[in-house]
Regions:
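Conserved small/polar residues in nucleotide/adenosyl-binding loops
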Residues: 2-7, 232-241
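Alpha-helix C-terminal capping segments
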Residues: 68-70, 92-102, 227-231
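Active-site-adjacent helical/loop segments in soluble small-molecule enzymes
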Residues: 31, 35-77, 155-230
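Glycine-rich phosphate/pyrophosphate-binding loop at beta-loop-alpha junctions
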Residues: 1-27, 79-171
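Gly/Ser/Thr-rich loops at beta-strand to alpha-helix junctions
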Residues: 1, 53, 82-90, 220-225, ...
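Generic helix-packing signal
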Residues: 30, 34, 97-100, 229, ...
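Generic beta-sheet signal
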Residues: 78-80, 234-235
């Protein structure tokens, strides 16, 4: 929106750099800078997206806050459907669950850039090049290389640093990798993950339906999350934690 654009352009302490590419290209630059500790220290550079562990720590807090608001007993479980492209916010949900928060399901909601949905359905992780990343009506999720996914995969692989480095280094550069059925079953059963994707038409239909039923105007990213709940056939009482 125009307001959102002005927030990122008009303040005198902001300097914008334009890249000819997609989100993944921008994130590659941030990762390269973050990987050079001496350069970062010399120029006092930090990142405020979910590459920075501090952001995930803050996001963990609002999973706990949300759980406290909707539950009545200490053992009551809640499921979260999270619109995601970079696997950041939902990675915080995974961390909260590992810390002991009673989370039943974590639903990965993607748009047409469905690399993550494909993984949780099939075990195949195939990051796409920038040229194949689609521009959609939920643009914050127009990402084909999820930087935080490696953090979850580390847990899924038994915290095997060498195997994780091999998969997300050599294998991803070669086009991706596949995990066996047992690992995907563990993602669902041990870590609570489900996934779903939606199209532009799905988002429009969901926004219309929610507005007519609840008099609430959902944004397109929220619509992706709502659609994913329907897609995974999660029962309504589970989303309320009952």
């Amino acid at each position: 929106s125009d307001v959102y654009k002005r927030q990122g352009l008009d303040d005198p302490n902001i300097f914008n750099i334009a890249l000819d590419g997609v989100f993944d290209d921008c994130q590659d630059v941030v990762k390269a800078v973050s990987g050079d500790a001496d350069f970062k220290a010399a120029y006092r550079i930090g990142a405020v997206n979910s590459i920075n562990w501090a952001r995930l720590m803050a996001q963990v807090v609002y999973y706990i806050s949300c759980w406290l608001k909707v539950t009545e007993t200490a053992d009551q479980k809640v499921s979260f459907s999270v619109p995601t492209g970079n696997f950041g916010d939902i990675c915080a949900g995974h961390i909260a669950r590992q810390m002991g928060l009673p989370i039943d399901r974590l639903i990965v909601a993607t748009n047409e850039n469905d690399v993550l949905d494909e993984f949780f359905r099939t075990g195949n992780y195939r990051p796409r090049p920038a040229a194949e990343t689609m521009a959609t009506s939920s643009p914050s999720m127009d990402i084909s290389r999820a930087s935080n996914f490696e953090r979850f995969a580390f847990d899924l692989l038994g915290r095997d640093a060498a195997e994780t480095a091999e998969l997300f280094g050599t294998k991803v550069k070669e086009g991706g990798f596949s995990l066996d059925h047992d690992k995907i079953a563990a993602a669902r059963e041990d870590y609570g993950f489900l996934s779903g994707s939606s199209s532009h038409a799905d988002r429009l239909a969901t926004i219309k339906d929610v507005h007519e039923r609840f008099d609430y105007l959902a944004d397109p990213h929220t619509a992706d999350g709502i659609k994913a709940v329907s897609y995974t056939h999660l029962r309504a009482h589970e989303t309320r934690g009952n």
